[in-house]
């Protein structure tokens, strides 16, 4: 049997051909508008956001200037000038009266004053060196975005000289031999960061690893909290001084305070989540709590915080920004800490002295 034919369907509208795409009119940009366009860079955007956050915190922590503060500073300045004038007048009167004992006291006081002024000048110079290092890092970041020729090599030679790298160092000679006239500034800086900069970075990483391990072991075996706090504070201060010395920076009192402030700010905003993630990874995947004691787990946490402090101090003292994954990871120090604690601490059956 055959099916009946379906009736014809008539459409009121005629078939339309394929629609042509609607093109937008061309847009012509002048030089000023072209300068506003820049390639997207997630790393630079992250750094800018971190810098903005740090700037906001610095502005919040910075005391606001007021009229009372200016009056206090003016009064102190007048008091200092009056003291200097009185001191000079006293020396003149002692000379006129031939009071040699008073002149001896004046000479000793003058030596103390000049020593204090010299100390302030040296502190200012050290603080200036820390500020110059930050400017050098900004210059290196700009050279990494620059495709010109001629500035990169001069900049890197300056960094090698400041770091105290000898001229016959194999890494420095290899870098110089690899340079070619066709290399732009970005390529020159990248080669320096890959071949010469690791000479110092490896020493700094070893120092951070050793200090983190000592802090972790001290917390794991020490029975007194006050001893732990004093030891950790001393080791952290020594770690920052050592990192700065390896990178060719001499820290004074004020520059050390400034570096501590920057390090702690960075840790507060970017370190807490990383520490929690690393510790949680160990507890969930390797069951650290079942293998080590509670004191050992506390030691791992303190060791990770010490390592984080060293990494941020390394970042602030380093003359070059991190390039293509050169930044040390907290997980590397975590594995070293766990291995050392497993090898040194007694077995699970033996209790650690509380």
Curated annotation (Swiss-Prot):
It holds the Pfam family DUF697. Keywords: Cell inner membrane, Cell membrane, Membrane, Transmembrane, Transmembrane helix. Disulfide bonds: none annotated. It is a multi-pass membrane protein. GO terms for cellular component: plasma membrane. The keyword Membrane applies. It is found in: Cell inner membrane. The chain crosses the membrane at residues 71-91, 101-121, 214-234. InterPro entries: DUF697, UPF0283. The keyword Cytoplasm does not apply. HAMAP family: UPF0283 (MF_01085). Belongs to the UPF0283 family. This is UPF0283 membrane protein plu2581.
């Amino acid at each position: 049997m055959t099916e009946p034919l379906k009736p014809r369907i008539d459409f009121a509208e005629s078939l339309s051909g394929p629609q042509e795409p609607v093109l937008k009119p061309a847009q012509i940009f002048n030089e000023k508008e072209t300068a506003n366009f820049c390639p997207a860079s997630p790393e630079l955007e992250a750094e800018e956001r971190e810098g903005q956050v740090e700037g906001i915190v610095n502005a919040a922590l910075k005391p606001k200037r007021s009229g009372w503060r200016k009056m206090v500073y003016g009064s102190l300045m007048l008091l200092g000038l009056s003291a200097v004038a009185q001191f000079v007048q006293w020396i003149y009167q002692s000379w006129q009266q031939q009071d040699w004992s008073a002149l001896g006291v004046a000479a000793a006081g003058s030596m103390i004053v000049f020593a204090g002024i010299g100390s302030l000048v040296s502190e200012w110079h050290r603080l200036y060196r820390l500020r110059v290092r930050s400017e050098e890092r900004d210059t290196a970041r700009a050279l990494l975005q620059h495709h010109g020729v001629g500035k990169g090599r001069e900049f890197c030679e300056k960094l090698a000289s400041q770091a105290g790298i000898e001229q016959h160092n194999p890494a420095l000679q290899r870098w110089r031999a690899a340079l070619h006239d066709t290399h732009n500034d970005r390529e020159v800086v990248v080669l320096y960061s890959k071949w010469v900069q690791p000479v110092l970075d490896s020493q700094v990483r070893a120092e951070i690893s050793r200090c983190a391990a000592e802090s972790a072991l001290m917390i794991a075996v020490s029975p007194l909290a006050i001893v732990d706090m004093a030891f950790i504070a001393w080791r952290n201060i020594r770690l920052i001084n050592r990192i700065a010395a390896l990178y060719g920076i001499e820290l004074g009192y004020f520059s050390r305070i400034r570096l501590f402030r920057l390090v702690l700010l960075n840790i507060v905003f970017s370190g807490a989540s990383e520490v929690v993630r690393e510790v949680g990874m160990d507890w969930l995947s390797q069951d650290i709590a079942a293998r080590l004691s509670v004191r050992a787990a506390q030691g791992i946490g303190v060791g990770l915080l010490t390592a984080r402090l060293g990494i941020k101090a390394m970042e602030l003292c380093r003359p070059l920004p991190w390039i293509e994954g050169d930044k040390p990871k907290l997980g590397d120090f975590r594995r070293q800490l766990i291995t050392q604690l497993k090898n040194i601490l007694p077995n699970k059956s033996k209790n650690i002295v509380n």
